[in-house]
Amino acid sequence: MKLWEADGHKVIAHLTNGHVVVGMADCYTSEQDEPDGVASIIIGDGLFFENQIESIELA
């Protein structure tokens, strides 16, 4: 699943550090709009960058 497709859905994200985050995905920001050039999304109350997410799926 692409990161932008998760926006507005409850998701399960497997992070590169081994943690798993479950929550509503919101506020997708493309790499073009991020200062560091890496897309991001809010899941629950945390902000995650695309390079921190190993995989993401609908919950």
Regions found by a protein language model. Give the residues of each.
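Conserved RNA-binding domains used in RNP assembly and mRNA/RNA metabolism
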Residues: 1-59
